[in-house]
Amino acid sequence: MNIKKAKEEIKYAIQAYLAKDEFGEYRIPAVRQRPVLLMGAPGIGKTAVMEQVARECGVALVSYSITHHTRQSAIGLPFISKKEYGGKEYTVTEYTMSEIIASVYDKMEETGLQEGILFIDEINCASETLAPAMLQFLQCKTFGAHKVPEGWLIAAAGNPPEYNKSVREFDVVTLDRVKKIDVEPDFSVWKEYAYQQGIHGAILSYLEIRKDHFYAMETTVDGKRFVTARGWEDLSTILKVYEDMDLPVEEGLIYQYLQHRRIAKDFANYLDLYRKYRTDYRVDDILQGKYTKQAVTKLQDAPFDERLSVMGLLLSRLSEGFRGAYEADLTVTGLHGALLELKDRFNSPYCQETPWENLFTGLLEEREAAFAKERKAGLLEKTAEHACLKELERLHFFLAEGKRSGCREKEEAFALVKGLFAKEAEGRENAIADASAMLDNAFAFLEEAFGAGQEMVIFITELTTNFYSVKFISENGSEKYYRYNAELLFDEKQKTILQDIEKAKTELNLLF
């Protein structure tokens, strides 16, 4: 199963486990809430998917790698206490609360979320002294004498034995108490995630051409050679920072993330080509509608790999524009909500004597506290977090401008803030207009170069895969996207019908 399907299975499990009956009791009792066990190769996104599931379900997440724990930290430290049995006092051994269970309660207190996921990574790599405690944890949902709180799903992840010499295989008794999900690497699924995370365009273009380099694990006389999804994502992050700082990116840097010499060298060579294509084809000029006939002819005559790379450059730049428009929309929507709330406070009969600055400051502090709480709970994805930070920054600016302008009355202050908000709304409209123009220009360039050929099919398919382009087009429209997408769907449907007819003919020939 790919990681996207595994994510859906985990979400469904959470929804089912947290469902309650008319008496407020969990419909599935804790003893029947099987832990979810993800088994798969290292670096394919098992930990990242838990963060996404927790965020999308609005629950807390406590994550631990069991290889960092000893028996004492997992089940608690022993201490001596006195107890009376049958009228006689005895000295007995008890245990402090497990560090892991204590972290669950700390998270509940910090975030206010009473339900969540307790995720234990590398669970089948626990030390020999800790292995019995792990089996007890999976079977009984306890660490030592302390149970995992109700409303918390237990999830764990491990690697198959071929990837880790420290692996201890679970017995049938343990496996019969978990929901085991085997996860396989899948580039097409990871690509959807990559677009949303803003993975470097060169990586996406390269992997589109070299899909077999997305994940590699080889054993040689010199040791392991490997490339993982985690490695590509971390490489993307460092590439962007290096480019922003104008630092050289060499093969040695790439090999630090892609620990497979042949693939690292191949990508380093491709990265040089990718940058050359960006300069040769003047991608920004294309998206501004300033492309030349020579650029069109050059692309028409180019090898297929080069065509894919240029389309990757266009898609990467478009994705940045769509992402910027999405973030601007989130920011303005948040500001609009804040202004409505501010207006209500200004007009409230209970706040007539309160200076406008105090009301504004109180609102700002409340929104900052709410943001800090959501951020602490991990409920915000990166773009939403940036939008919230921008919203708070603009609210601080609005307050400072009101004070600087010497506003005394609430009406005067609100009029000034409303005018400042209008400029932010105009900025959002400009971002949307710019992104729409870039999309139209990209279509115009590709139409002139390839018409409705396979390159256009690939372009439409990639737009449909990208979270930000789908969001942008669904809200702002694109005539050419709708037209080509409809033609593509029609062609696919027609192809399926023809295949079904041929299949039916074959079956009839076999019968007669």
Tell where the protein language model's regions lie, with residue ranges.
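Alpha-helical lid/collar subdomain of P-loop NTPases
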Residues: Q196-E357, T361
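Context-gated lysine
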Residues: K4-K7, K11, K20, K46, ...
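Alpha-helix initiation/capping motif
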Residues: S98, P149, D171, H200, ...
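Histidine (H) residue identity feature
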Residues: H68-H69, H146, H200, H213, ...
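Charged/polar, solvent-exposed surface patches and flexible loops
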Residues: E8, Y12, A16, R55, ...
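AAA+ P-loop NTPase catalytic core and its hallmark functional loops
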Residues: M1-D212
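Conformational switch/transducer regions in large eukaryotic molecular machines and scaffolds
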Residues: P35-L37, C57-T67, I80, E89-F119, ...
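Terminal-proximal interaction/regulatory segments of ATP-powered molecular machines
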Residues: Q300-F512
